[in-house]
Amino acid sequence: MDYTLTRAEPDGDNERYPLQKQEIVADPLEQHVHRSVYLGKLERALHNAVNWGRGNSLWPYNFGLSCCYVEMTTSFTAVHDVARFGSEVIRASPRQADFMVVAGTPFTKMAPVIQRLYDQMLEPKWVISMGACANSGGMYDIYSVVQGVDKFLPVDVYIPGCPPRPEAYIQALLLLKESIGKERRPLSWVVGDQGVYRANMESERQRKHGERIAVTHLRTSDEI
């Protein structure tokens, strides 16, 4: 198998996966569906049923780059029991996985390999960026490390930390499940670039801003 190594441009546009430029393409029967109240309700029920199935059976791809991968695999132990969320079935092939967790440092030489693995995944597919290195390069501000995996992949959920705890990974699964529940994809048997509606999820920092500001008693390191 031949690989082509390409240099990631830190300040360049995401030309391969222009997520922000996606347009929603209407299904040919969409206008007829919305003319009927019954068919409109049926369409909404079908979307909810499909999204419920996708959100409760997320199969991760067994892939890791660095120490964050160890924290990810820890969540599969009996202590955390990630099987409660239907995400315990680790797939060894990207063609059988639903989402990829980029856990670790994305080196420039590894970027085209990660991109190729992402291309081999079938739709619908999602990406979780786990750890400071995957989010922004972390402490490796150097030419050999891509400063954020979102330079060459569309990322759905970011997990901060160096490294994040397994509980943070489980919270990311819940956020991804919530995001999937609000998605709208064409209910068609035709596979193609038909456009996908993704909900604009509020970041956890903004959502908990009022709660953080209201804190008056700061705990010491021994109390945490």
UniProtKB/Swiss-Prot annotation:
Q: What class of enzyme is it?
A: translocase
Describe how the cofactor binds: Binds 1 [4Fe-4S] cluster.
| Binding residue positions for [4Fe-4S] cluster | 67-68, 133, 162
Gene Ontology biological process terms from the UniProt entry: aerobic respiration; electron transport coupled proton transport
Enzyme Commission number(s):
7.1.1.-
* Cofactor(s) annotated in UniProt: [4Fe-4S] cluster
GO CC annotation, single? plasma membrane
Its localization reads:
Cell inner membrane
Pfam families referenced in this protein's UniProt entry, alphabetically: Oxidored_q6
Q: Which UniProt keywords apply?
A: 4Fe-4S, Cell inner membrane, Cell membrane, Iron, Iron-sulfur, Membrane, Metal-binding, NAD, Quinone, Translocase, Transport, Ubiquinone
Known catalysed reaction(s)?
Answer: a quinone + NADH + 5 H(+)(in) = a quinol + NAD(+) + 4 H(+)(out)
Q: Which GO terms describe its molecular function?
A: 4 iron, 4 sulfur cluster binding; iron ion binding; NADH dehydrogenase (ubiquinone) activity; NADH:ubiquinone reductase (non-electrogenic) activity; quinone binding
Membrane topology term reads: Peripheral membrane protein
**What is the top-level taxon of the source organism?**
Bacteria
Assembly and binders: NDH-1 is composed of 13 different subunits. Subunits NuoB, CD, E, F, and G constitute the peripheral sector of the complex.
PANTHER family recorded for this chain? Answer: NADH DEHYDROGENASE (PTHR11995), NADH DEHYDROGENASE [UBIQUINONE] IRON-SULFUR PROTEIN 7, MITOCHONDRIAL (PTHR11995:SF14)
Main function: NDH-1 shuttles electrons from NADH, via FMN and iron-sulfur (Fe-S) centers, to quinones in the respiratory chain. The immediate electron acceptor for the enzyme in this species is believed to be ubiquinone. Couples the redox reaction to proton translocation (for every two electrons transferred, four hydrogen ions are translocated across the cytoplasmic membrane), and thus conserves the redox energy in a proton gradient.
Similarity annotation: Belongs to the complex I 20 kDa subunit family.
Protein name stated in the entry = NADH-quinone oxidoreductase subunit B
Q: Which organism is it from?
A: Sodalis glossinidius (strain morsitans)
Its lineage reads: Bacteria, Pseudomonadati, Pseudomonadota, Gammaproteobacteria, Enterobacterales
Q: What gene name is listed for this protein?
A: nuoB
